[in-house]
């Protein structure tokens, strides 16, 4: 292989890096690089990695995983390297390396730091482990033994670009700095002092054999620490299993930013000394030291010597960080000789000329390119597996994973198509270039000498890598390869041109002198254009006049160059050397760096970017001279986020100038970004913006107030002066603003710029698009008919769906355009037939390709970019792509690749927004706008990517518009809106100075500038012609491109147009339109002409009735037909995707670009209207929209909200911490109040949930899962724990009470409460506690890094030290919590020892009564805890005059221990209560809907299923459609008995499927869906739903057989379950004993004598004694008769026995005996968990009530949950259809949140189901009482695997259904509450 190829291979590798770091050794190491030029240490040929055996002072790079953006999944997998997920093998590395981990900072930005955004860093141990553990872990890992995280999980996570270690907290772009932990490394070390040089290595330490690596957390960096460690007694040996347990016992802190806050300390836990637990109790002064407090000491010198020797050997071992590539190499061509610099020095590559095919296998070996941890990329070596094992390299697990990934990649290549491979290779090329740049020094930042031999070395920052990855390199090597970097470093170190606050021109500005010719100091070969020289002179003139200004030149005129030349002129002419602060967007950072290098080479420009470690290095080495403390730099280049994150540090300087690029981000004067930057001490301010000041006059004032606060003091004064400028003219406004704003446009200043010509190409839809278009309109006919009464959001969503249809039919139904397995031509034709635009684009691109043009294609929708990318691949057109998902270096590489000279790229795909800022693509001369933006301004920005300085050809703009569609109307109306409503920028005079001319409506710049009337007219446009067009079945669209181009509407740019691009591009109306009456306005006439005709017509006229009826008939027929078709392969969601997407509230898979706008919106025909009406059920409602905040911003806000005391009063601090400085404070305060109120309301509604669940918790895991689920609240699309959030508020509140709010007062404040001293490795006392509390108040708890960097807190040398010394973050968190508890206790004592007292029972009773009355429904929406519930139950039971339904006051799940009193009285009251039920208020019968965040509201009671519900029922019952079909069609040749058996068998199969479908639902929803599904089944037979269910239940009992009875009896005797009375009240032990008496036996015998015919008169099913009534049945029947007397009319029955047979009570009774007989095997649990009959339940699985049991009695349900005690006030009928919601909240509630809802009055019934609570079998609404049921398994009814003997229809195997119907997973946490099937006592 040639040398070039070898160098190339040096950089190719995977996309991930290891999470670990090489340890910082205790001694100072000698040795330089391993290159030939290194002095002294290169002769060590035994060094296995080619490096000095005892290491070198090379800082290890930051933990990162390089994201290969844009890769397909297979490509990403192919790119993944050998790294595990950071736990298995990386834990081994971290244990053996002992480095202190470092989290990536949230603000990891910058061109050299871009990839930090897709990086996760694992936190490794904080102590130096001992060698025994190192060897043990190495051996175990290499032997295949798994660490606590399995290799499988490691492999899975290694494919992603951001791997999260199970023991590390995530460090995504939203991660905060609080998760960062400094790592102990050798990087960025200062030159050692003489004392350090003379310091000897620590003597070997002797230890006893029991001393384990995890027992020591002391640093061994000094002799003092060594001696300290020797005096300590070794702790007992900690086994590996115990270590794992310690890791699993990590507790989540309430202040954690995420649930895994504390994970960053997990690995440290594995290596910390097992010392005595630290008590933070207040120590009494008279406490004496007990003998037990003293540690015994044992010392084994021989063992210590052995340990030291082993440790020394281990230190010489290198660690694999990454494996970059693999090759078949010549045996022996490994090690140091394969480094880049060794090859260059030797002049040959030892591997050159090697031919694998011609070399014998004996001379060939597999070799791997290794990136060594702690060494830069130039030290990468090729190694074989043998050499790695010989050198005892750590991290060998990575090698195994890498080999595995290589095999997977090879497999993928064999089966992948050529297009996929080609795309993958292109991405690999970009990756290759990026890795290659890592071998080049970007900048030398420090110089030092090695401590052993005094050899010079340089601290080098590498290209495309952050400062944190800087490494010390041998001076000889650096000088040989990067001489220029060394010279530049020396120049900077010796420069006299450094900032000084005494510079005269800062105080006394010089007289302005015009620069007529380009100055000599500007780089040779670079020339400023005339208008740029004018701009430079204007900037200098403004500076001399002390005017801060706004440079508002149009995009593409070189504002960046003018600004840099301005600074360089101050530097050279006026000797003002800074400091200058340039705040620029991250996307333009690379461009700014390049321009500074070109135009101002003598200025020392420092890019202040990266994570906190990088910024620390900058502050240490780049900020100031060590000796004089003078500033080193001239200019700081940074971003908004960084400058605000470090605003206190940066705010200490007096800046000579502040420059803000993209300054329109400062248009809101209420944002924290604005306020923070405004506070900076600056001598001059310059705002740079290329976007016209487009919204309102106030935004213009905000910018002017920022630069000149004295001249533009208040908005009120400015508005008074210029508010009426529109009427009186702009002369006065222009005169006032002229000195402060400069705006030129290209046509005025750049005469040489080629013209820009726009053509609108109108194209017809294909037949498929027309079909979908009409289908969407027809589906939404009901919504469209509402007209102005309709919902704006509904109209907008329909428009968006139609826009997607105009783009491509695949956006409506992606499943119809699957290209996998299709031939090349066939796949291409499949794509083309879905879009008329694509047909035209295909012809247009082919022509442009032939003529040598290069094309930019813009689209709003990322999914459309996916389709276009598929098309370009099929056409083999080389292209690049840029959308919001492609960031950092990959973005730069794509731009450079396209703009490179001789580039073969033909197309560049861009999203309209991602491609709108800071991108120069002037090498393209054609722009195709595939779909126009709502706002034409965005399209203008897109066009400016190509039409800018440097363009040599005419720029052709092709805007594709679908004719006679909403799209055409949108374009037309957008032009009018932008002219009429947007703010027009006019020329002020011939100088080109322009300004915003009028105050207007800021809302017009929103993403949707149209109101409801506009949307209605847009929808009607072209619709009538479309429906009249009957040629929908035409063949392929005929597209004559020549004819289309000839007919195209052409808009040539007119240089003489006196308005800006906005007007010149559209030529719709002149400026006079604003001064004339509306009736004379041309634009008004156009608007009327466009919309009047369409708007006058009704949708009934537009969409023909026959077409609507045909569509409806087709849909109904299709619904029925689907029931009998074979199962489809597509899932239920896909089957109705188009239907729901275009019809009832469907929402496609959202794909958003960088701005979050490229989404497929949910269609809103059933959405919430403007009147706030709820949505229909059947589809998930759209998530709550929090105006102005994305989900990511909400997460950051909530995370920061939990960190600060009194958060509602600390919004500014929260905004800074959450990086929301641009948001107005009023909006943030509104959001904070909303967050707080929502938590308070939620906890008020669920105030008893915690105590109730606490009674049933058995395991910590169960408690944690339940807590998360029970208290989970949503704000927007973000879920959070309401209880934890309020707990954080309460725990931090005392700090707010004692801490002064003013910074000056905080400096004087002292914490004077006595505390126990912590066990830290630094001096820590009251002063440090005081500063820690001040830091928590100022920065929030957990923001330890900010506290460390704040010089006023003086904690820099106390916390987060770069070694293993405490305190680290975990210790600080513990200390902070301890101090907060002490403060809380002190505050309470100060207030008089107030304690929270328990409420008296009377108040609870009153509350219950009030709650019952206020709900005016069958149930209080708020679940109660046990104690309150008992009080409620007693109150209601004892209230003789109460007319409230007993269920109203019934608790959710009351403990049985609360039930006291005389059982006889209880029975009497219960009977009376059941009688009162019939006389309860009618409101009690109305079903209610309960939502966590809203008041209960009545459900609409319908007479039939909603269509969306019907569709869902149809899909759920699809597996048994044959049984449904056969249900009412038995074979007439069969006897009556056989036909009856046939019906039973069908119902068994159907009922079983219903049970399977109900499994995934919360208990509160099971009742409703059971009702819906049985009602759906009733449509296939003449029987009603109740009757069908009754037959099904009876068939289940008959099917169970006699053996079930015996088993049931056995189970029944296994325990003593609690007995339940008919009203559900759980009895005491005495009643249980009585139930076991002989009287019970007699009752049972009596009940058995009753015939089945009497009990089931309608079914005609013969029954025998074994199906006789269960015990207590007669008493229940009496209650039934009492409660139901006088009511009749139930289907199939009347009064008396008929009515009884239909009652729930009877149904539950009948089921009881059979359920005892039925043996529930493993299928009951879906294959897992104990069988119900195994004795895991006391009293057997069929216990109706679990009474109070003794502590020794085992009562464990499935999954380790104990069944809870029975509720009081309980009646069986409450639960049959009304048990809901496993978590007692709106879990999955939103899916059906509007179904059956009505505000109607009383007396309405739902399919005759809502007669009375005890007679309502299938209520439509929510239950009268939210009982939660025990989990019902799929095979509960005794049909194993769906097999029914003798069933004529074929049985369905539900578990393996291809549509993936929900089945209870193996480890699903069982519902811990009682089911409605376990209601009655065991007999």
Curated annotation (Swiss-Prot):
Q: Where is this region: Disordered?
A: 1-293, 1074-1185, 1246-1265, 1390-1491, 1599-1829, 1848-1883
**Its Enzyme Commission number?**
3.6.4.-
Q: Does the keyword Nucleotide-binding apply?
A: yes
What ranges does the record list as Low complexity composition bias? Answer: 39-56, 159-172, 1613-1622
**Compositionally biased tracts (Basic residues):** 1393-1402, 1466-1476
Q: Where is the composition biased (Basic and acidic residues)?
A: 1106-1121, 1600-1612, 1627-1638, 1773-1794, 1805-1817, 1868-1883
Biased composition, class Polar residues, residue ranges:
1-14, 114-128, 236-247, 1437-1451, 1742-1755
User: What does UniProt give as GO cellular component?
Assistant: chromatin; nucleus; polytene chromosome interband; polytene chromosome puff
Protein name, please? Chromodomain-helicase-DNA-binding protein 1
Q: Which organism is it from?
A: Drosophila melanogaster
Q: Which gene encodes it?
A: Chd1
